[in-house]
């Protein structure tokens, strides 16, 4: 598989000769469309063995005040009750598949390839939307018809993630509210960026945003702080990955995207010193 994707039109089909399972409204020839003053919004959930919270995620989508959306679920071949939950809710899911994949970003790419909406958003299988999330999004789409992407505020256990500060991207990834739950991108803009690069196992979203902002020079906006899209549960995908692997991914992304090598080395040194200092402090406290 190539490391770079030029367009969303050519994502490789599944390597499985036969999908394990698939379903949804599209399989019954029900296809939703964009309406005057009501753009179609695609919501994608990727899941693997997520039966603990998946129903809460689905329920939060059912409760949306704004109704012109399509919902896609990409399951990585779960072995718990995830597939049964999906089937129990198939009347409100536009399309779902359940098959083995190459990880979370492969699943994201499958969802992007299936999206028919004017805007696309991703919500993890343990997070939830506020009931007015898509209503707020639609308001911003109407106010800023030429904008490429929108970041909404997201609640975490310690407070609210808010804002969008693109000038920080060259030295920090903390320039936006949230990749999932709080981020929506115009479908046509997503096609220009391409897919998540599967070369990066843990931080392909950073590479995606770097290409979006630096390479493609796209324009985005953040909602007001209290215009909250959703709730981000504690302990996401990257929280389960060893710190050094995350750092390796970050350095590789910056290097591959042509950042100044001296800046990369400085950031590497800074983060190593910060981490060692943090470990030392925790050791003293114990």
Model-assigned labels for residue ranges:
Residues 1-60:
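N-proximal low-complexity "stem/linker" segments adjacent to membrane-targeting elements
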Residues 128, 132-163:
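Conserved donor NDP-sugar-binding/catalytic core segment of glycosyltransferases
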Residues 98-115:
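Glycine-rich, basic loop-to-helix element that forms the pyrophosphate-binding segment
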Residues 163-246:
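Conserved nucleotide-sugar donor-binding catalytic segment
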Residues 59-68:
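Short, acidic, metal-binding catalytic loop of nucleotide-sugar glycosyltransferases
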Residues 75-84, 124-127:
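A conserved acidic beta->alpha catalytic loop
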Residues 239-264:
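Catalytic core of nucleotide-sugar-dependent glycosyltransferases
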Residues 120:
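Short aromatic/hydrophobic "clamp" motif used to bind/position activated sugar donors
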């Amino acid at each position: 598989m190539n490391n770079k994707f030029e367009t969303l039109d050519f994502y490789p089909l599944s390597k499985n000769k036969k999908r394990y399972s698939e379903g949804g409204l599209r399989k019954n020839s029900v296809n939703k469309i964009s309406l005057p003053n009501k753009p179609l919004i695609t919501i994608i959930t990727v899941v693997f063995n997520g039966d603990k919270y998946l129903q809460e995620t689905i329920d939060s989508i059912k409760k949306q005040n704004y109704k012109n959306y399509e919902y896609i679920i990409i399951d990585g071949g779960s072995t718990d009750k995830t597939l049964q939950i999906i089937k129990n809710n198939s009347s409100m899911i536009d399309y779902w598949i359940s098959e083995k994949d190459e990880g979370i970003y492969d699943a994201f790419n499958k969802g992007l390839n299936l999206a028919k909406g004017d805007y696309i958003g991703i919500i993890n299988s343990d997070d939830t939307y506020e009931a007015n999330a898509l209503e707020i999004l639609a308001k911003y789409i109407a106010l800023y018809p030429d904008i490429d992407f929108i970041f909404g505020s997201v609640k975490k256990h310690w407070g609210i993630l808010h804002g969008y500060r693109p000038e920080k991207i060259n030295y920090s990834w903390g320039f936006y509210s949230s990749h999932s739950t709080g981020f929506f991108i115009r479908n046509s803009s997503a096609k220009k960026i391409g897919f998540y690069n599967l070369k990066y196992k843990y931080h392909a979203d950073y590479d995606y945003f770097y290409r979006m902002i630096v390479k493609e020079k796209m324009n985005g906006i953040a909602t007001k702080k209290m215009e909250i899209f959703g709730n981000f549960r504690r302990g996401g995908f990257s929280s389960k990955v060893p710190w050094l692997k995350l750092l390796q991914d970050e350095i590789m992304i910056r290097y591959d995207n042509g950042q100044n090598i001296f800046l990369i080395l400085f950031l590497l040194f800074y983060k190593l010193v910060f981490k060692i200092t943090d470990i030392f402090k925790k050791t003293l406290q114990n």
